Amino acid sequence: NQASVVANQLIPINTALTLVMMRSEVVTPVGIPAEDIPRLVSMQVNRAVPLGTTLMPDMVKGYPPA
């Protein structure tokens, strides 16, 4: 099973992502792959992301589609 990126804390809208905000976890449905965590650093979320929420490609501004 592939690990996805999950919010490690509440991430407010328009916040630039940092490593501390994200963790990898095997979840369903699958979100952004965990190996993309380094690419996500400094990208902004376009909505508030609650703790434990899987990051989906449409939540991150400028994240390339799969």
Curated annotation (Swiss-Prot):
Family (UniProt): Belongs to the type-III AFP family.
Name of the protein: Type-3 ice-structuring protein HPLC 12
InterPro entries: AFP_Neu5c_C, AFP_Neu5c_C_sf, Antifreeze_III
Keywords for this protein: Antifreeze protein, Secreted
Main subcellular localisation: secreted
Function (record text): Contributes to protect fish blood from freezing at subzero sea water temperatures. Lowers the blood freezing point. Binds to nascent ice crystals and prevents further growth.
Compartment(s) of residence: Secreted
Source organism superkingdom: Eukaryota
Cellular component terms (Gene Ontology): extracellular region
Sites annotated Important for ice-binding: Q9, N14, T18, Q44
UniProt note on tissues of expression: Detected in blood serum (at protein level).
Domain AFP-like: 4-63
